Amino acid sequence: MKSLRWRYTRLPSQVEDALSGEEDKEEEEEKEEETTPAPTPVPEHPMVPQLAGASQVLGASEMSQLSLHLPPRVTGYSWSLAFCTSRDGFSLQSLYRQMEGHSGPVLLVLRDQDGQMFGAFSSSALRLSKGFYGTGETFLFSFSPQLKVFKWTGSNSFFVKGDLDSLMMGCGSGRFGLWLDGDLYRGGSHPCATFNNEVLARQEQFCISELEAWVLS
């Protein structure tokens, strides 16, 4: 090889020696470039999910941020507006009716009368139940104004419970991470063991201005 001749042959000047060293270095760099894999490109901005319906609560930025925290299995799913209070009225029973026939996960989002946006992701459709249901994929979130996500701690499995007159998500010491009344007008939020969450609204008790339930499928 040419590089071996340069290494063992006496060169007439230091200039030639320096040049040979530079060429050796260039050959080594070329080999490194051939063997080093190119880094995987990272998207500059999260993708806005495909929507079937228009949200009165979340904008494109909030939806994109939330999509980054959804379980990998729902990546690429479209969001369908199954229920909204402006269209279907302020009624928990109406919400349950709109959930009939759906089995996929649900993103519940709301804005209270203070303008605060928050909600929850449920791994399955919202429904009436005798006890708590759901999986560890369930989480709570709030925009205050930056997005905060409160994932399952593993402390208990009190994910979602649907009664005729209330909907509850997360529980601990008799307090709920998020609960809504039967009229979908009043609600509350407290720290709970399920998600180790902060109070989602500005106050523990709040009044709902707009609520939406998006089915992911």
From Swiss-Prot:
It comes from the Eukaryota. Residues 56-217 form the TLDc domain. One of its GO terms (cellular component) is nucleus. InterPro entries: TLDc_dom. It holds the Pfam family TLD. One of its GO terms (biological process) is response to oxidative stress. Residues 19-35 have a biased composition (Acidic residues). Residues 1-48 are annotated as: Disordered. PANTHER family: NUCLEOLAR PROTEIN 7/ESTROGEN RECEPTOR COACTIVATOR-RELATED, TLD DOMAIN-CONTAINING PROTEIN 2. Belongs to the OXR1 family. This is TLD domain-containing protein 2. It comes from Bos taurus. The gene is TLDC2.
